[in-house]
Amino acid sequence: MAVPFRRTSKTAKRKRRTHFKLSVPGMVTCPNCGEAKLSHRVCKACGQYKGKEVVSK
């Protein structure tokens, strides 16, 4: 098996990992009830999506 010729420095390792990060979910407020919800998804509090009741509460 191949083995690295030189040890990877802290800087090189950290530069490689700059793109390895978590992304923040797209949160918006529900226009019906004002609760925070994920965009393009049904509101968990009132059950509405795009002004229509999808889930009966």
From Swiss-Prot:
Keyword Ribosomal protein: yes
Single Gene Ontology BP annotation: translation
GO cellular component: large ribosomal subunit
Entry keywords, A to Z: Ribonucleoprotein, Ribosomal protein
Any single Pfam family the record assigns to this protein: Ribosomal_L32p
Lineage: superkingdom: Bacteria
GO molecular function: structural constituent of ribosome
Keyword Ribosomal protein among UniProt keywords: yes
NCBIfam families: rpmF_bact
Similarity annotation: Belongs to the bacterial ribosomal protein bL32 family.
Protein name from the UniProt record: Large ribosomal subunit protein bL32
Natural source organism: Lysinibacillus sphaericus (strain C3-41)
